[in-house]
Amino acid sequence: MRRVRVGDEVIVTAGRSKGKQGKILRILGDERVIVQDVNMVKRHTRPNPTANKPGGIIEREASIHISNVMLYNPATEKGDRIGFRRLEDGRKVRYFKSNDEIIDV
C-alpha cells in the first residue's frame, strides 16, 4: 500500500514549486509523481501532420520525486505525515499522524 495514491490532495515540500498544492494525476514507477498544476515546464513540439498535431510551445506538468510531497490534511490545513493501521475488521488503512484521523474509509 502506498502512502500517496492517485487523486490524493498533496502539498509540495521542496523544490521550485514548494508550497503549492494539487491532486496527484499519475504515479510513475515507485519514486515519481505528477501533480496537477505543479512543476510546469514548457515543451517545444514540432508539428506532426500525419498525427494531425500542431506544433508550438506546450505547457505541461513534469514529474517530481515522491519524497517532495506530503498528503494535505484539511483539518490542520497543512501537509501531514501518514501512518498505517489495521482496523478491527482486518482492513489496512492510512491515517494522519497529527490527529489520528483515518484517510481511507
From Swiss-Prot:
It holds the Pfam family ribosomal_L24. One of its GO terms (molecular function) is rRNA binding. InterPro entries: KOW, Rib_uL2_dom2, Ribosomal_uL24, Ribosomal_uL24_KOW, Translation_prot_SH3-like_sf. The keyword Transmembrane does not apply. One of its GO terms (cellular component) is ribosome. One of two assembly initiator proteins, it binds directly to the 5'-end of the 23S rRNA, where it nucleates assembly of the 50S subunit. Belongs to the universal ribosomal protein uL24 family. Part of the 50S ribosomal subunit. This is Large ribosomal subunit protein uL24.
